Amino acid sequence: MMQLRKFFENPKKAFCFFCFAIIILFTAYRSVNDFFYGGGYQWQETRQTANMAEEVSLSELYGADYEIYPFGINDSTAAVFCTESIGDTMKEEKNFLRKIVLYSMKSGKNIQEILLDHRYFGCSICDYEGGTDILFYTRDRLEQNCLLWFRWDKQKNQMIQILDKTIENPFSDYTLIAEGKSAALISYSAEKNELQSISEEEARPFLKLVGNEIMDLQVESNGTDILVMEKLAEKAQFRIYRNGRSFRTRPLAENEDCYSMHLLKNGALLYLQIEDAGISEKRLVWWPYHGDEVTISTGMLYRGISDHQNTALWNEFSQSGAKLHRVYIDEKKCIHEVLDLEPDYAALPQITLYDRKNRTANIFLNDFQKMGMIPLS
């Protein structure tokens, strides 16, 4: 005690101690504040008219019989796949996956073309640093359900086939998610209550799930964390896993239904339908890792939601017109931007982010016949 008293009797030492204590307290406050409110956001809503910068006629490139879907973009190349519908009526109509194409935006020519002949039932697209993977749900000539897994290596600018696998389980049991700087093919094992990573040779444990008797499961990833929607016997809920452990949960209310979910850098976008007193409303909700959720938009319909790590882009339809929305994470802020669409581009069937790192433009299809770019501020 005597030594401590002598220490404080020295004005210089006492002043230094006081300053040091202030720094420690301030650092501790910032750490605690970041822990609880690190998922905070600020609305920085801007409005402008979206103008088309470049436009390509897909029907001239690939023929009017095909429907063309973009699934990956960089500054010089578009990756698309082509399907063809055969049959006169909806009951007899069959959809076939015909080709996968890498198209040069600079030269206007195909870089690579892979021809296929499978019945097409949908796909799962996974974008990550360095590449884009696409999983096709198909049926072969023997009427067997097949998974076709392709990888677009953006550095080599080439499509590579990863997997051609016949399956017995439903297509809905399989999806692609980002896993670090690559992608993983994930399947849910109800017997072991875990997600499994599927390869040609084996299925290995990927994530042990919390809870039992999961009836249905949807999975999303931002490359490091996993978002699942669990449908249990009596309820449904969203759960985020971090480092293999349950990190945060959000119950799905009885009057809520989930159309889609998108896990970004420090939060999730949940596209929900709310039933209230006989009135149905579609709602896009931002659910941050820390802090309270916020409703971003309540338009009539959202289409083409595309997400990648820290950016989500989607098209909104409402009675007041069509708009292009962008939400992106800048450090610890969630910034929301709105672009009013010209009437010619008011009905965009599909939107894919372009130049994802710099968030400068997007590419889309107009009536599945045109492909173009819209610069973003």
Predicted feature locations:
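Structural motif
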Residues: 88-101, 142-150, 191-197, 234-240, ...
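Residue position within the beta-strands of beta-propeller blades
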Residues: 80-82, 134-137, 185-187, 227-229, ...
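Short coil/turn segments that connect the beta-strands within blades of beta-propeller domains
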Residues: 75-77, 130-132, 181-183, 224, ...
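A short beta-strand motif characteristic of beta-propeller blades
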Residues: 54-61, 109-115, 158-165, 202-209, ...
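N-terminal "mature head" segments of proteins
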Residues: 4-9, 13-127
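Short loop/turn segments that connect beta-strands within beta-propeller blades
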Residues: 105-108, 152-156, 198-202, 241-245, ...
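Blade-level signature of beta-propeller repeat domains, shared across WD40, Kelch, NHL, RCC1
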Residues: 346-377
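Repeated scaffold domains used in trafficking and secretory/extracellular systems
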Residues: 64-72, 118-127, 168-179, 211-220, ...
